[in-house]
């Protein structure tokens, strides 16, 4: 196996540094998505030149074991032959038509087959577009205005969902981004994740005005925090009782943690469990701009052109993106795929935990399928305030030590990590060895 570089390039000769300097003159912050700027951890972002399998190479020619996987989509690894072949064939047939294609129908059929809660599905181009459209759909289908979200859950950057929790119970939201007028989020209730009593109180106060409850079943922007089974069960019960729609945001977890998504994991403990609407993204595009939302036929038929809820997109169902997504979904259905992926991911988390504990460093981790997270804490957190107690300075040092060893984790404390089918036992071993060196010498 080719070994990663372990000697950082001096800033004076680094192409990464030169590219970042050029980028900052033209692109706000030098990046096109804030987390890529390394602002949380410090240092110079790596500008990626190419990727293959479980690795990518930066502008200085250094190779890294990749645990961000384009923030989730690359479940097969980079450049999987079946996906590359499908995309090459699609490109030769045309980039975009602005008209329906057979592959749109085929991708919809695959999604409906694999996710039992989805009877109809609409394809869009990003996770933000999916969740934004879901909010409009839920309000249109119910005739209600209020929505519930949870502190620490990220549902994209649409105005109504960029909300932080205020103090006290079920506080009406205030924006967490400049440029979002307060009146836009006045109908957004923000509750504490995994807090059943607060959830019950919110429905008691506002139940008949709530259009939907939106939740990340595994919150990947709190690093990796699971909603407890009793909490999800109560979410379902209260939504049913008050005729509100239960929305699972599975943009990150869909097809990443299990073939049927996180909802299939909860259905193992809650008989008959289904959300009303599901938002999907990342894996269904295989690395191309692709997302979707789907649910019961009764709800989805409120969408135009059947109903009065308008949603549209020039590139929705793009023929190249659907080819990439279809090829990916067909690969992950092969026998044993998720068993092997889950075992490899668990071995990584177990190895990191052992390395830290041997050095007396508080550390805990969790995983499901090919998604994982870890905290510099003694016990797994259950909500955002607990996540905030993790040791940020130590994480930043850990991040840079691993980066210098050729291991690329998310450059932020609150982001989940991802393992692909291309990661090998040797990759995991090299990663754990690098972590062991850091913890022993901290």
Swiss-Prot record:
Catalytic activity: (S)-4-amino-5-oxopentanoate = 5-aminolevulinate
Listed GO biological process terms: protoporphyrinogen IX biosynthetic process
Pathway it works in: Porphyrin-containing compound metabolism; protoporphyrin-IX biosynthesis; 5-aminolevulinate from L-glutamyl-tRNA(Glu): step 2/2
Modified residues (N6-(pyridoxal phosphate)lysine): 282
One Pfam family of this chain: Aminotran_3
Protein family (similarity comment): Belongs to the class-III pyridoxal-phosphate-dependent aminotransferase family. HemL subfamily.
Name this protein carries in UniProt: Glutamate-1-semialdehyde 2,1-aminomutase
Biological source species: Polaromonas naphthalenivorans (strain CJ2)
